[in-house]
């Protein structure tokens, strides 16, 4: 699979990226190189290779799942222009 100049312009348009005509050949080469690399990865024989999530065997540290209120409600709402009972007061937006 290869990317042509029209495809580069379409991708740029969909991504809302401004691309000049001078940049199209460079981007075309970059995209084609990426696709070639992905095709190369597809040719790698991975039969018998166990899936892995990390190169080093380690366990995530776990904490006790304890429910609390954070004990900082006053600090959380301190910068709000209007509060009531630790809740933010906002202007009514739906009538």
Swiss-Prot record:
It catalyses: L-glutamyl-tRNA(Gln) + L-glutamine + ATP + H2O = L-glutaminyl-tRNA(Gln) + L-glutamate + ADP + phosphate + H(+); L-aspartyl-tRNA(Asn) + L-glutamine + ATP + H2O = L-asparaginyl-tRNA(Asn) + L-glutamate + ADP + phosphate + 2 H(+). GO terms for molecular function: asparaginyl-tRNA synthase (glutamine-hydrolyzing) activity; ATP binding; glutaminyl-tRNA synthase (glutamine-hydrolyzing) activity. Its EC number is 6.3.5.-. Keywords: ATP-binding, Ligase, Nucleotide-binding, Protein biosynthesis. The keyword Ligase applies. Transmembrane segments: none annotated. GO terms for biological process: glutaminyl-tRNAGln biosynthesis via transamidation; regulation of translational fidelity; translation. It comes from the Bacteria. It is an enzyme of class 6 (ligase). HAMAP family: GatC. Belongs to the GatC family. Allows the formation of correctly charged Asn-tRNA(Asn) or Gln-tRNA(Gln) through the transamidation of misacylated Asp-tRNA(Asn) or Glu-tRNA(Gln) in organisms which lack either or both of asparaginyl-tRNA or glutaminyl-tRNA synthetases. The reaction takes place in the presence of glutamine and ATP through an activated phospho-Asp-tRNA(Asn) or phospho-Glu-tRNA(Gln). Heterotrimer of A, B and C subunits. This is Aspartyl/glutamyl-tRNA(Asn/Gln) amidotransferase subunit C. It comes from Rhodopseudomonas palustris (strain BisB18). The gene is gatC.
